[in-house]
């Protein structure tokens, strides 16, 4: 559904979509599912082809003794199906706008710090169901690769929060 709506919206980020679908109102979801049924089938088919082909490639590589290493970023993009589908898992306000975003503090490498702009997780919310979103994410990644590296793993034990809308990372904490 996400990609079908995104295509119909001219590839605009989901947080710029019409309010009803941006906020995932049940009546809007139903309407868009019906309106985009053919496109949804297309995206399902394309994903099926990818996973079939990737599975064959991985099997061939493994048979030849080659292990595939994957790299999963600690944070997901704001403009992603993950954030749109599960906004309660991210530090967003009542309008689904980030309150704080990810980055790194200023240091010798960068006097302004690094402003990545990804929405931060609501770990307290994720803990309520045993971090099932994370477990599903890792499990899905591990079906594609033999070894998975989490990029900026340190983000699991601490993070740097920057007020949303800031031009640099200087005001983070």
Residue ranges, per PLM feature:
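Alpha-amylase-like alpha-glycosidases and glucanotransferases acting on alpha-linked glucans and related
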Residues: 1-51, 76-173
């Amino acid at each position: 559904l996400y990609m079908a709506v995104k295509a119909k919206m001219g590839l605009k980020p989901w947080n710029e979509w019409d309010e009803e679908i941006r906020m995932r109102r049940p009546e809007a979801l139903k309407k868009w599912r019906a309106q985009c049924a053919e496109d949804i089938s297309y995206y399902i088919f394309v994903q099926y082809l990818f996973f079939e082909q990737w599975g064959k490639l991985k099997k061939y590589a493994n048979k030849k003794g080659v292990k595939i290493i994957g790299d999963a970023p600690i944070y997901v993009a704001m403009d992603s199906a993950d954030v749109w589908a599960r906004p309660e898992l991210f530090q967003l306000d009542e309008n689904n706008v980030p309150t704080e975003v990810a980055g790194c503090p200023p240091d010798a490498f960068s006097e302004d710090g690094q402003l990545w702009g990804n929405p931060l997780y609501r770990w307290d919310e994720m803990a309520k169901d045993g971090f099932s979103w994370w477990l599903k994410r890792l499990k899905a990644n591990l079906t594609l690769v033999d070894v998975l590296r989490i990029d900026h793993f340190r983000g699991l034990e601490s993070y740097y929060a920057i007020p949303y809308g800031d031009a640099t990372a200087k005001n983070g904490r």
